[in-house]
């Protein structure tokens, strides 16, 4: 399995078909996965009223690693991993926030996004039961873990406090 690391400038990818109706997913901070999904990694397709544009990464540093463990062990800085799914509303709301956080902390952390549908074995290994789930790794080891969407300033504060970084 090849894992790509991309940092900074992740384009928004959630596009509601109708902008008139308020989406209930916009008020959620995380999505709980049914046990069938956690166990088998299969997911029902989203409703026809929601469309998702593909994630695109612009102006990013891209590296390829043989495995996720290789990525964690060989990173020269802590790695914030965003476990997400394309159908998850709160995950899509985090895209511009992660872009901002990645830019703000570009000298301190690397940001990696892992699609739980494409890599269910990683989701199972790290017991991902809600989306989005963020795991901060330092020196290849799990350092901090939290679930749910956060505003950029709270996410930066959480990361800095966890790493004990003062700007």
UniProtKB/Swiss-Prot annotation:
Q: Which residue positions hold the site described Deprotonates C-terminal active site Cys?
A: 82
Q: PROSITE patterns, per this entry?
A: THIOREDOXIN_1, THIOREDOXIN_2
**Keyword set for this entry?**
Chloroplast, Disulfide bond, Electron transport, Plastid, Redox-active center, Transit peptide, Transport
Specify whether Plastid is a keyword of the entry. Answer: yes
Q: Where is the transit peptide?
A: 1-58
Annotated GO MF terms: enzyme activator activity; protein-disulfide reductase activity
Question: What subcellular compartments does it reside in?
Answer: Plastid, Chloroplast stroma
Gene Ontology BP term (one): response to light stimulus
Q: Which residues form the active site?
A: 88, 91
The answer to keyword Ribosomal protein applying to this record is no
Disulfide bonding pattern of the chain: 88-91
The similarity annotation says: Belongs to the thioredoxin family. Plant Y-type subfamily.
This one is known as Thioredoxin Y2, chloroplastic
The record lists the organism as Arabidopsis thaliana
Lineage runs:
Eukaryota, Viridiplantae, Streptophyta, Embryophyta, Tracheophyta
